[in-house]
From Swiss-Prot:
<dbReference type="GO" id="GO:0005576">
    <property type="term" value="C:extracellular region"/>
</dbReference>
<keyword id="KW-0964">Secreted</keyword>
<dbReference type="InterPro" id="IPR010255">
    <property type="entry name" value="Haem_peroxidase_sf"/>
</dbReference>
<protein>
    <recommendedName>
        <fullName>Peroxidase 5</fullName>
        <ecNumber>1.11.1.7</ecNumber>
    </recommendedName>
</protein>
<keyword id="KW-0106">Calcium</keyword>
<comment type="function">
    <text>Removal of H(2)O(2), oxidation of toxic reductants, biosynthesis and degradation of lignin, suberization, auxin catabolism, response to environmental stresses such as wounding, pathogen attack and oxidative stress. These functions might be dependent on each isozyme/isoform in each plant tissue.</text>
</comment>
<dbReference type="Pfam" id="PF00141">
    <property type="entry name" value="peroxidase"/>
</dbReference>
<keyword id="KW-0575">Peroxidase</keyword>
<keyword id="KW-0560">Oxidoreductase</keyword>
<dbReference type="GO" id="GO:0140825">
    <property type="term" value="F:lactoperoxidase activity"/>
</dbReference>
<dbReference type="GO" id="GO:0020037">
    <property type="term" value="F:heme binding"/>
</dbReference>
<dbReference type="GO" id="GO:0006979">
    <property type="term" value="P:response to oxidative stress"/>
</dbReference>
<keyword id="KW-0408">Iron</keyword>
<keyword id="KW-0134">Cell wall</keyword>
<dbReference type="InterPro" id="IPR002016">
    <property type="entry name" value="Haem_peroxidase"/>
</dbReference>
<dbReference type="GO" id="GO:0046872">
    <property type="term" value="F:metal ion binding"/>
</dbReference>
<comment type="similarity">
    <text>Belongs to the peroxidase family. Classical plant (class III) peroxidase subfamily.</text>
</comment>
Amino acid sequence: TQLEAACPNVVSCADILALAAR
């Protein structure tokens, strides 16, 4: 995802938040 390219380190946290928000 775009986040991965922007912050591959934060992807884990951002991804979880995005999935939870969904």
